[in-house]
Amino acid sequence: MSDQITIGVLALQGDYDAHRQTLSLLGVRSVLVRKPEELDDIDGLVIPGGESSTFLKFLDREGFLAKLRDFVSQKPAFGTCAGAILLAKEVRNPTQESLGILDIAIQRNAYGRQIDSSIMTGPTKLDGPPLEMVFIRAPRIERTGAGVEVLAEREQHPVLVRQGKILAATFHPELSSDTRVHELFVNMVREQEKPRVQVTR
């Protein structure tokens, strides 16, 4: 039975295909989002990793930023690595513009450059075993607001957080065989869509 949801994956940079593959494994319809108007046709949005300052240049150039701000204020969004930076309320090292929707302070490239990237497992509040986490030039969450739930940690720093309909990971769950983080986001989108589905019956 179809869940009647469509999740968009922002396809301006980063490994957006890996996110689509994971969503496909979960039986969820996904589309690549490259134009602002394509946000109108989706129920949730994945913002993949990459370089956050480059992301901003693309968004400014394409007229995306205002439309994206409006989207994340109303519908579920999931940011990984650079995507988490874009969602954050405060960005450090250096400071930069962001969507400001997620009440965290995040430091860019906190764990070193790409050569220092790592794969590890860590404790998580998600059901099941410890979570495999792939870090690539990862940012570090240095502060979380009162409404932010920490779902996984690395060295006592949050690496997976949720605030309402917003989910963010400083690692790359799309590069792991563990699909639980994407499953969580899919369920968040389904929950958001329930009232709309019920009204149209």
What residue spans do the PLM features occupy?
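Hydrophobic anchor at the start of a short beta-strand
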Residues: 30-31, 77, 166
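Amide-donor transfer/coupling interface in amidating biosynthetic enzymes
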Residues: 108-201
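Solvent-exposed alpha-helices and their adjacent loops that cap or buttress functional pockets
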Residues: 1-3, 37-40, 70, 78, ...
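Short coil/turn connectors at secondary-structure junctions
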Residues: 4, 42, 73-75, 96-97, ...
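N-terminal beta1-alpha1 cap of cysteine-dependent amidohydrolase-like domains
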Residues: 1-61, 67-70, 179-183, 187-201
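Cofactor-binding loop segments of dinucleotide-utilizing enzymes, especially the Rossmann-like FAD-
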Residues: 12, 82, 171
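Redox-cofactor binding/interface segments in oxidoreductases and associated redox assembly factors
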Residues: 47, 79, 169
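Cysteine-nucleophile active-site neighborhood
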Residues: 52-123
